[in-house]
């Protein structure tokens, strides 16, 4: 029996998500925003951007956004879905770029981070002037609509419920892979569409690897166990990490947990609209560096989350991305001791003018799990 977590959005409806976000009115507003940001027709080839703008989920489609026209190019497999979109639909063979260049204007903008070289070469050979863009649609997607925020809140509510159950589970004697399977199946039971990404369960020395793959390692007493796992609802992701203890920890790890938590709380306080990702990262990083552990925090403080698990804005030392109201980001410092273990504490938040709306409710105090 599925034990679904009910989440009510600000509108009062249960489980509002991507489908409501992609009604005709919403799509036209999104397209209008893209049109305002370009000075040449934009060829959209990144699948998630095509999906966000039209509602078409396809592995072989392109979208041309023109000032007064919107065209989807796809093959017969996706025609029925494409015809439901608020756009003209043009059927072309599966080899999209064998036919597409002859149907395009002589000058277009394109998504430089998703268009492969062979496809660009086909455009060039057809004499089409190409103008590269970087993260244009992604920058617009970074500010979430109410329905998108509700879907992310729902995914976070399921993640929180899973963590409550996880804290009651035995860890010692189980493998990382067993616990990862339990996490994913529990999120399904709670009503998730699926996991936002393959769950990370990293025990002992594996915890020093930020993106460790759970394997056959058996969890032992006196270790940290880094659990990075979250739910997905209606195409929108959550994200969360908590670090558990399986008994008294070595002093080095116990101190690192306290420092990581202090840095995480400072980063949360700094996560406000109008600040750059670099500046927010620096606030948390300074706390960890002053404690003498800065070299062990080797990744950025956080990233945007939405239809993708990693989106704009980035919060890392070199990032000039500016945080905006209704953006969704992680705040996740980590301290990693090679050969010993790791600590990471991650919350998902909605950016506000002042304090962020924190979606992760599971405690950040160090939880010692049983057996």
Model-derived features with residue positions:
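Active-site neighborhoods and metal-handling regions in enzymes and metal-associated proteins
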Residues: 2-371
